[in-house]
Amino acid sequence: MQANTPRPRCPDCNRPTSHCLCPLISPQPSATQLLVIQHPDESRHALNTARLLTLGLDNAQLLVCEELPPEWQAWLTDPHWQTRLLFPRPDAQPLDSRSCPAPLRLVLLDGTWRKARKLLHVNPLLQQLPAVLLDNPPTSRYRLRKASEAGALSTIEAAAEALATLEPGFERERLLRPFEALINDQISAMGDDVWQRNYR
């Protein structure tokens, strides 16, 4: 019996080539530098929004790890930059130009809440960064995951809101275009009945 042949995938967005999202990705600039630290378990997830996020920005990088490599520890402590962690810690300040003065580096953690907290736990340097949070975040469009915490957003949604808050003229919808297509494609694949029964 012949084994199933894996479907070819786009090397950039990592989607099956028949469902490649790259035509919807239009990278845009930002004065804010973004670092997305992704838990390794999340990198294998089909709905990987961190990859779409970093493809959609000229000034963003994706780091897949649990413990930060030494070179990234130096990046986080560069005295020429103001570095903030976008995470709803109890001491987090509302994100705005006062809590995030330029030149700014913004760090986001990508994973489930449990995995994100593990990233914080094993990296004391992340714990030491001043934390900021989104003030009155919108309802998530991530209709395929049930968040365990109120106001939770996917990584790409959180970044879009943060940059729209910090930088006048930033095109939030331009960044979210492939994300919307990804969600709609997954709902179409599972069928509306299944989606209604499990996610509505």
Task: For each feature predicted by the language model, list its residue ranges.
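Short, flexible, mixed-charge glycine/proline-rich loop motifs
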Residues: 1-4
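Residues immediately within or flanking Cys/His clusters that coordinate Zn2+
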Residues: 7, 17
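Short Cys/His-rich "knuckle" micro-motifs
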Residues: 18-24
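S-adenosyl-L-methionine/SAH cofactor-binding core of RNA-modifying enzymes
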Residues: 55-121, 125
